[in-house]
């Protein structure tokens, strides 16, 4: 290492020592029981920085120290800066030393780390406190969200062997519209227009795909096609949906049981309650289990235009998974009569997210539920930049069950 390298390394160590020292002094002050406002905390930090005579700090260095200390005390420590970076979509903390980020669909290692397990555990407790929830060794798993709506999963020891694990899927004030998804190549303009008409006409639509393929984002985009004069009820495990410009909107969120195992409110409970709330449309963030029967019954009893998502490897697999969720001999008939369309999403080799198939669910035939592909992604190779090239190709000119389109005055399908 040359002289400049030694100098920079030595300076970074001095700045780190200064930052840690100021933070410790302020923590001691807070431990004495003094309640201070954010404004006063900022003033105290600046005063402490000015008092440090053993190192001359540039303005940029002073501001950096101020931000770090404020985030450690009032925010989420080293995660705060990452949360404020709009280019980051997901933050994964695997113990104190390993932090990974998702940026533009790709994972990368972050240079930041937590000083010790106590600091990381403190952040986990702060997140839990925001939603008035409990997470500890007895209850080591928590799914919750931050004040801005970002979804958070926390797993603590002894379940997490290498220390607390925190995963944050960030929430954006401005959700992706179908126009932006079209611009990103996730769907063609023609297929997007077809889905817009299907939503307006009241088709029941399931969005399927694997983890992280953008199901909730796509559900958000489709929900904005719902006519503005309709009453919408959303039901979620953890609130993520961002339906804009809906005047008559009711948002419901499930609740885990308390430490005594009581007061749980499930998706199924909320679905049953929603049917007594005069909904025009019911949107369920994700169907995972027994609530599938209630969702299918709602779709079959006049609540057309309902939307939901589910984990699956294909549109056909989504049907199979629904069959296993519903303990009923007549389940296939219920599925065939309830669901009109399945939109299947996937992540490509280049990490991009695309609509891979739009399929129509047909009436039961010989005890099976047939699917009819309307659009299908056709890969056409790879570009020089490594991007997967291709487009959604229309496989069927018209819908077999087009009664809802006709009733809505929509032709051409």
Where are these regions (language model features)?
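N-terminal anchoring/assembly modules that precede and organize ATP-driven motor systems
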Residues: 1-108
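NTP-binding/hydrolysis catalytic cores, primarily Walker-type P-loop NTPases
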Residues: 350-413
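Hydrophobic positions on the alpha1 helix immediately C-terminal to the Walker A/P-loop
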Residues: 218
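Switch/coupling sub-region of P-loop NTPases
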Residues: 192, 202-208, 221-338, 344
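P-loop NTP-binding catalytic core
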Residues: 85, 98-201
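Conserved lysine of the Walker
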Residues: 215
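Active-site phosphate-binding and catalytic loops of NTP-dependent enzymes
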Residues: 54-57, 74-85, 127-145, 230, ...
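Walker A (P-loop) phosphate-binding loop of P-loop NTPases
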Residues: 212
